[in-house]
Amino acid sequence: MSKLLGSEILGENIKRLRLSCGLTQEQTVARLQILGSPLSRSTYSLIEMGRGNIFVNDLVGLQRVFNVSYEEFFKDIPPSRSSKESTP
């Protein structure tokens, strides 16, 4: 399974989306588990704090739970630069 690297901004965006839906972490995780995700609340909490990695399938689940576009998750995250681009 593919993972997305942890990011503080990604975590903040996930938290913002959860709160805008009026959900607690427990409610969000319960909905993800109904969709087949084995994600625990403690792991979800780490993701929101930008200290944990998220599986792509869990991001897909969050998109369904929050009913938002994928762009909302990556809002305000600057594009990464490859090492080739940063070398003079």
Segments the model singles out, each with a brief description of its role:
Residues 51, 55-72:
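DNA major-groove recognition helix of helix-turn-helix/homeodomain DNA-binding modules
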Residues 2-4, 27, 64, 71-88:
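Short, charged recognition helix plus adjacent turn
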Residues 14, 25, 41, 56-59:
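Helix-turn-helix DNA-binding elements, focusing on the entry/boundary residues of the two helices
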Residues 22-46:
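Short alpha-helical DNA-recognition segment
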Residues 19, 33-34, 49-51, 60, ...:
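Residue-level detection of the helix-turn-helix DNA-binding "recognition helix"
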Residues 1-21:
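A short, Lys/Arg-rich alpha-helix, primarily the initiator
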